[in-house]
């Protein structure tokens, strides 16, 4: 009887210790929210047929290289700058990330924009054209130079995107530069946080893409 009396309080004490230990375990770290530029632009229209009703007119080809970026923009971190404190320092959000590096997201948008009026080729497709037809299409090379949420004050920020672009044409003597330009876009963020920065950077990227596509058409 005495042993039974001692055993029950001991079992209760052990159970209490276990419950206390479980309650003291750290919570699982919150998973970072992943973002991209949204579902994309409207699908490009089909090539228009000729006046005689024959097959649709073939779109001009353009080779789109991979978008380059400096080492600061190689990762998937969502970056911001405090312009009112130290604009030279890039800071990452802790719980907000891009689903892919910004250069890849930008290239997807650029390909969508160009495909409305061009047959867009990647590096491998361009190489195939060169082997089979003995020619290379004009080539567009883009470098992403700035991609951050820029805080002008604690409560006001913009999405800041800057790219440099070079359009070249392959010739027997080597590539000839047709045009070269830098594009910059700033779009206001609806909120002074990571999700607001995502919306602003997506809008600024779309603005840069629209301007770049129009420039390509004019330069050719």
What role is predicted for each listed range?
Residues 2-12:
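Bacterial N-terminal signal peptides that target proteins for export
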Residues 18-21:
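C-terminal motif of bacterial Sec signal peptides marking the signal peptidase cleavage site
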Residues 23-104, 219-220:
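A structural "domain/chain start" motif
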Residues 25-42, 117-173:
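Surface-exposed short loop/turn segments
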Residues 58-63, 76-78, 86, 102, ...:
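Envelope-exposed proteins and targeting segments
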Residues 88-97, 171-213:
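Short secondary-structure boundary motifs at beta->alpha junctions and helix caps
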Residues 111, 115-119, 149, 213-220:
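Sec-exported extracytoplasmic/periplasmic mature domains
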């Amino acid at each position: 009887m005495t042993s039974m009396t001692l055993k029950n309080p001991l079992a209760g004490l052990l159970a209490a210790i276990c419950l206390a230990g479980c309650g003291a375990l750290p919570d699982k770290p919150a998973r970072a929210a992943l973002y991209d530029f949204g579902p994309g632009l409207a699908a490009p229209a089909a090539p228009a047929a000729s006046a005689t009703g024959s097959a649709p007119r073939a779109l001009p080809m353009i080779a789109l290289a991979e978008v380059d970026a400096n080492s600061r923009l190689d990762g998937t971190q969502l970056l911001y700058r405090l312009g009112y404190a130290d604009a030279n320092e890039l800071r990452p959000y802790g719980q907000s990330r891009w689903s892919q590096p910004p250069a890849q997201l930008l290239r997807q948008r650029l390909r969508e924009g160009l495909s409305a009026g061009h047959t867009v080729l990647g590096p491998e497709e361009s190489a195939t054209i060169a082997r089979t037809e003995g020619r290379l299409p004009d080539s567009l090379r883009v470098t992403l130079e700035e991609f951050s949420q820029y805080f002008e004050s604690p409560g006001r920020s913009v999405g800041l995107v800057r790219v440099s672009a070079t359009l070249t044409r392959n010739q027997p003597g080597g590539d000839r530069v047709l045009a070269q330009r830098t594009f910059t876009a700033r779009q206001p963020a609806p909120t002074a946080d990571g999700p607001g920065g995502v919306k602003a950077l997506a809008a600024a990227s779309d603005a840069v893409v629209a301007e770049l596509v129009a420039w390509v058409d004019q330069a050719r």
